[in-house]
Curated annotation (Swiss-Prot):
Mg(2+) binds at residues 33, 38, 40. Induction: Repressed by GolR. Its cofactor is Mg(2+). Homodimer. The dihydroxyacetone kinase complex is composed of a homodimer of DhaM, a homodimer of DhaK and the subunit DhaL. GO terms for molecular function: ATP binding; glycerone kinase activity; magnesium ion binding; phosphoenolpyruvate-glycerone phosphotransferase activity. InterPro entries: DhaK_L_YcgS, DhaL_dom, DhaL_dom_sf, Dihydroxyacetone_Kinase. The gene is dhaL-2. This is PEP-dependent dihydroxyacetone kinase 2, ADP-binding subunit DhaL.
């Protein structure tokens, strides 16, 4: 069991940094989506995370526990982010929060469980499998790393391997034909393009990694 402990302030910083990342990469993610989707992935995520960060101080004051913070953030994303990514990311954060009811601190094993179950909620919502050219092509390889982790290993090394697996999974979408979403209609024309949801998902999980490094 790791001694690494994360409190509500940690997750507040994560959400702030996720918002900053999305602002920085908004045009890049929107460009990816323009190739095979509606061309609004980065824009929609920007709208959602701006609203989360707008309400963040109030959320941390009114809802000091991690569960409520993440569930309310997920509900904001669900309501503010258009397209498929709103329900998917909303489901992820809401499930992460639901996993730790009333807690103001979680350890590394609990964090891993939150992410594993959050990814399962995304899969349940989107009904996507590995190879469908969706964010599950990033999440599923990453989840496998967390599920098979050595609980005695260094948490940073474990989470780095998780993020690396997600990044590789995102890259694996480039040669795929899409089986879900708007890209489905393109058929073979989707080959050669990176799935925007898989790209944003590993990038957002990397934000958690960077904050874990600061917490050690």
């Amino acid at each position: 069991m790791s001694e690494l402990v994360m409190d509500s302030a940690f997750f507040g910083h994560v959400l702030q940094d996720m918002g900053a990342l999305i602002e920085k990469e908004r045009d890049y993610l929107t460009g990816l989506d323009s190739d095979i989707g509606d061309g609004d992935h980065g824009i929609n995520l920007s709208i959602g995370f701006r609203e989360v960060n707008k309400q963040l101080d109030e959320l941390l004051t009114v809802s000091p526990d991690i569960a409520t913070l993440l569930k309310k953030s997920g509900m904001i994303l669900l309501g503010k982010v258009g397209g498929a990514s709103g329900p998917l990311y909303g489901s992820f954060f809401m499930k992460c929060g639901a996993d730790v009811p009333g807690k103001t601190e979680v350890n590394f094993d609990e964090l891993c469980g939150m992410i594993i179950n959050g990814a399962a909620a995304v899969q349940h919502r989107g009904k996507a499998e590995l190879g469908d050219k969706t964010m599950m092509d990033a999440f599923l390889p990453g989840v496998e790393v967390l599920q098979n982790r050595d609980t005695n290993a260094d948490p940073i090394e474990t989470f780095s391997a998780f993020v690396d697996a997600m990044h590789a999974g995102a890259q694996s979408t480039i040669p795929l034909i899409a089986k879900k979403g708007r890209a489905l209609r393109l058929g073979e024309r989707a080959i050669g393009h990176l799935d925007p949801g898989s790209e944003s998902s590993w990038m957002l999980m990397n934000v958690i990694l960077e904050n874990l490094k600061k917490a050690v």
